Amino acid sequence: MAVALIFATRARIKILFFDMIFSLEKDPFDLFSKWYKAVLNSPCEQPTAMTLATCSKDCIPSARVVLLKEYSKEGFVFFTNVNSKKGKELTENPKAALVFHWIEFARQVRIEGEVKLLNDERTDKYFSSRALGSQISAWCSKQSSILKDWQDFEQAIKLKEKEFHNTQVSRPDFWVGFCVIPKVIEFWQEGEYRKHIRFRYTLVEGSDWKVEQLYP
């Protein structure tokens, strides 16, 4: 909270408020990149954290915080166990929403779109870059299923460490990457007295985006 108090001062919010108005990009990815780089270059505690909302085939929503691992004009990438709750829901209903909330900058980005699986090559590349402990844990975690005894998990990790001793850890087939391909991206900047600035980008055709300002 100390960092938030330093950065989210009224004076700073005013500067960011007018910066958004006068430096609006035609392409939402360019604006996201600008905002994201500013966050990465600041003492923000969790710059890559984003809320991921999914929905089951029965239209029951769920949400959780995951970490952004890659982004480009193709979309926003994260990795997970395909057998987890979110993995199953994205397989059944490949649509999702994301929310970035950077409280230090009094900014929020909302994203809605379709979801696709990354190919094995890209997923393998990222998996190989992970810490050894994280690779082993990925093998041993039956994500979202009931764990009756923590020692069972610890024991599975020890066995897997022996199995992969002095060898490269391969990626389990159930560990996958998803890419959220945006149809809508909304940027929100806090303003004084709740006079917030909101701009919504909607994909209309090909790579063309329609930009609309919304009431706060």
From Swiss-Prot:
* Known cofactor(s): FMN
Q: SUPFAM superfamilies this protein is in?
A: FMN-binding split barrel (SSF50475)
Q: Which residues form the signal peptide?
A: none
Q: Which PROSITE patterns match?
A: PYRIDOX_OXIDASE
State the protein's purpose: Catalyzes the oxidation of either pyridoxine 5'-phosphate (PNP) or pyridoxamine 5'-phosphate (PMP) into pyridoxal 5'-phosphate (PLP).
GO molecular function ontology, one term from the record: FMN binding
Question: Which amino acid positions bind substrate, per UniProt?
Answer: 69, 126, 130, 134, 194-196
Please name the Gene3D superfamilies in this protein's record.
Answer: Electron Transport, Fmn-binding Protein, Chain A
Tell me the protein's name.
Pyridoxine/pyridoxamine 5'-phosphate oxidase
Q: Which domain of life is it from?
A: Bacteria
Keywords assigned: Flavoprotein, FMN, Oxidoreductase, Pyridoxine biosynthesis
Residues annotated for FMN binding in this entry: 64-69, 79-80, 85-86, 108, 143-144, 188, 198
* Protein EC: 1.4.3.5
User: Could you tell me what the cofactor note in this record states?
Assistant: Binds 1 FMN per subunit.
Which reaction is the catalytic activity of this chain?
A: pyridoxamine 5'-phosphate + O2 + H2O = pyridoxal 5'-phosphate + H2O2 + NH4(+); pyridoxine 5'-phosphate + O2 = pyridoxal 5'-phosphate + H2O2
The record's listing under NCBIfam families reads: pdxH, PRK05679.1
Gene Ontology biological process terms in this record: pyridoxine biosynthetic process
Pfam families in UniProt: PNP_phzG_C (PF10590), PNPOx_N (PF01243)
- Natural source organism: Wolbachia pipientis wMel
Please state the pathway this protein functions in, per its UniProt record.
Answer: Cofactor metabolism; pyridoxal 5'-phosphate salvage; pyridoxal 5'-phosphate from pyridoxamine 5'-phosphate: step 1/1; Cofactor metabolism; pyridoxal 5'-phosphate salvage; pyridoxal 5'-phosphate from pyridoxine 5'-phosphate: step 1/1
Give the family from UniProt. Belongs to the pyridoxamine 5'-phosphate oxidase family.
Give the intrachain disulfide bonds. none
